[in-house]
Amino acid sequence: LLLDTRKTTPNMRIFEKYSVRVGGGYNHRYNLSDAIMLKDNHIDAAGSITEAIKLAREYSPFIKKIEIEVEDLKGVEEAVKAGADIIMLDNMDIETTKEAIKIINKKAIIECSGNVDINNINRFKGLEIDYISSGAITHSAKILDLSLKNLRYVDDWKRRERKENTWDTKR
């Protein structure tokens, strides 16, 4: 499944996330309260992946899934041992991703992320992953070129219609 990210245009998130769903994609998180996602800053503050996951479990409702972003195989191993629900493989090449999949061995949901766009998404084809997340589907979407020139035509048409439907008292 293809997921968007929170990387959206200010004040346009609701529309951009809706467009992802209409286009067949899925929303990752609408805001920070939707799920717990531990990134490098959280890991650094906690001291380790294991400690970050432990603290997240301790201070969050049991129903919330804990996702952790990892950048190497050592991080994957630690995340699996610590019991992460979702492991995001960030910016990993395909060979490293294949090794990570073996290490995870269905013990967690696998999400691949990092510079994923329309030109390179096929690299994940055939891999046993659950999700691919891409900020490009919102922050790099092509803008539809709209013109207001047609409004002039509509205004002319409405004026003509009014003239034809007006009773002329001089006749």
Indicate residue ranges for each PLM-predicted region.
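Short alpha-helix boundary/capping motifs
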Residues: K107-A108, R152-Y153, R160
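Short, charged, intrinsically disordered terminal tails
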Residues: A136-W157
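Short, low-complexity, charge-dense intrinsically disordered segments
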Residues: K158-K170
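Acidic/glycine-rich phosphate/pyrophosphate-binding loops and surrounding catalytic core
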Residues: L1-A82, I86, K98-I103, I109-C112, ...
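Short secondary-structure boundary segments
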Residues: N91, G114, A136
